[in-house]
């Protein structure tokens, strides 16, 4: 479930930060219509949430807003537009379904996105979500028990434009557990690669058996059917100028639809990570 709040100020959030932190942990995403925070308020909000749920930036991160937490340029999707030689319609995917940086150890656990420019059709550029904690909870129990023991690697890797291309398996490819514990509430999160292919490498730290491989492939296909190919399991949000979203990227699979042109839609971004990038002395 996506939580949407209207008619609220930045001060209201700070004055009730415990309440909104609890809502965030419950829903995985908070959307504040027409909140329109300043850039300093964006930074302060993310640090305040970080103090309570355990991501960085938080109050231990001193100084001005900065990389790698802050994106210094607003996102207008120039790189994504460069991938296409044709217009992407409003009912087509502009950015495929994915879980942010599933392959990284210090993956992005959260983000604040503030739509600063939106000069396209109101139905264009929608962002879709699937809560992968809830998704995992509704899977058969024997599948859950199996997936918790699985390590995988991705057989697609991004190039300099972020376009994924198929690669051969090698031991040097990053490997990860496909189910991890949430950094704050410890609930299990299912984090498959929804737009690329995961390869099963270990089950309970042992090489997978033929039966393991068959079961994993069955679950993988079912997952795609129930996420990417199942609109009924997706929630889509229509943006307007000033809308501000705080999202738990560790658990929210997301995608973006087209229908807009380069320069019509842009938003500011602050990223939260599981671990600090600062050197602690």
PLM regions with names:
Residues 1-243, 251-281:
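Non-heme Fe(II) oxygenase catalytic core, chiefly the N-lobe of the double-stranded beta-helix
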């Amino acid at each position: 479930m996506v939580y949407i709040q209207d008619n609220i100020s930045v001060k209201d959030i700070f004055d009730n930060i415990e309440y909104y932190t609890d809502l965030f942990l419950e829903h995985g995403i908070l959307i504040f219509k027409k909140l329109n925070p300043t850039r300093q308020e964006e930074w302060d909000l993310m640090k305040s949430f970080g103090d309570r749920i355990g991501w960085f930036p938080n109050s231990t991160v001193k100084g001005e807003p900065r990389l790698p937490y802050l994106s210094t340029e607003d996102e207008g999707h120039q790189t994504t537009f460069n991938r296409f030689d044709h217009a992407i319609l409003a009912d087509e995917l502009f950015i495929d379904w994915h879980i942010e940086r599933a392959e990284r150890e210090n993956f992005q656990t959260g983000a604040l996105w503030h739509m600063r420019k939106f000069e396209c059709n109101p139905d264009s550029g929608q962002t879709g979500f699937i809560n992968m904690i809830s998704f995992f909870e509704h899977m058969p129990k024997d599948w859950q028990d199996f997936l918790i023991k699985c390590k995988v690697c991705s057989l697609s890797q991004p190039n300099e434009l972020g376009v994924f291309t198929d690669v051969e398996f090698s031991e040097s490819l990053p490997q990860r557990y496909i189910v991890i514990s949430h950094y704050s509430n410890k609930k299990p999160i299912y984090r498959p690669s929804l737009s690329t292919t995961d390869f099963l490498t270990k089950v309970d730290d042992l090489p997978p058996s033929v039966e393991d491989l068959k079961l994993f492939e069955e679950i993988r296909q079912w997952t795609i059917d129930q996420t990417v190919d199942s609109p009924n399991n997706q929630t889509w949000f229509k943006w307007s100028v000033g809308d501000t979203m705080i999202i738990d990227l560790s658990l929210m699979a997301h995608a973006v639809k087209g229908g807009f042109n380069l320069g019509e839609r842009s938003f500011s971004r602050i990223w939260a990570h599981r671990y600090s990038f600062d050197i602690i002395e």
